[in-house]
Amino acid sequence: MKVAVGSTNPAKVEAVREVFLGIYGDVEVVPIEVDSGVPDQPVGLEETVKGAINRAKQAIEKTDADFGVGIEAGLYRVPETITGYMDVQFCAVVDREGRITLGHGPGFEYPPGVIRRVFEEGVEVGIAMGELVNDPELKRKIGAIGVLTHGMLVRKELNKLAVLMALVPRLNPEWYGL
């Protein structure tokens, strides 16, 4: 089985590799640089989902893969939170028939100073967090979640949960009409 990932970010590519390998066994994962078609910092569920779907579709279109996978993180409004926003990773999986399945991982809040920079300066959360901890490659490694959880959950693991959730209908095709 061949799986194309609409990203070259190791935290995304390895998450896809590990989940697909665990479910399907032998799998070839091909990272493909694509344009998400949404702002670098998506805001709102619609924008975030659109980014994940665009990544998945472009990945499969540019290859002969069986599946295209897109992962997009974005902020969305949540009442009663400290900042008013939470971050969530959405995953889209598209197959050769064009069927799309979606999933997302756990949501979490960024520090208020990071959210302020996003909305006042237009800075992407990954960049703002990288600057906060003096690591410009943070989003390609443990991610903000790795810093915020003191290493208890890293970005790859967060992405793996989103990928697994997007595969739930494919693991149970008879219940989802696939």
From Swiss-Prot:
It comes from the Archaea. Pfam families: NTPase_I-T. Mg(2+) binds at D35, D64. It catalyses: XTP + H2O = XDP + phosphate + H(+); ITP + H2O = IDP + phosphate + H(+). Its cofactor is Mg(2+); Mn(2+). Binds 1 divalent metal cation per subunit; can use either Mg(2+) or Mn(2+). GO terms for biological process: nucleotide metabolic process; thiamine metabolic process. Keywords: Hydrolase, Magnesium, Manganese, Metal-binding, Nucleotide metabolism, Nucleotide-binding. Substrate binds at S7, T8, N9, P10, A11, K12, D64, A65. InterPro entries: ITPase-like_fam, Non_canon_purine_NTPase, NTPase/PRRC1, YjjX_NTPase. Its EC number is 3.6.1.73. One of its GO terms (molecular function) is metal ion binding. Belongs to the YjjX NTPase family. Homodimer. PANTHER family: NON-CANONICAL PURINE NTP PHOSPHATASE_PRRC1 DOMAIN-CONTAINING PROTEIN, PTHR34699. Phosphatase that hydrolyzes non-canonical purine nucleotides such as XTP and ITP to their respective diphosphate derivatives. Probably excludes non-canonical purines from DNA/RNA precursor pool, thus preventing their incorporation into DNA/RNA and avoiding chromosomal lesions. NCBIfam families: inosine/xanthosine triphosphatase (TIGR00258), PRK03941.1 (NF003039). This is Probable inosine/xanthosine triphosphatase. It comes from Thermococcus kodakarensis (strain ATCC BAA-918 / JCM 12380 / KOD1) (Pyrococcus kodakaraensis (strain KOD1)).
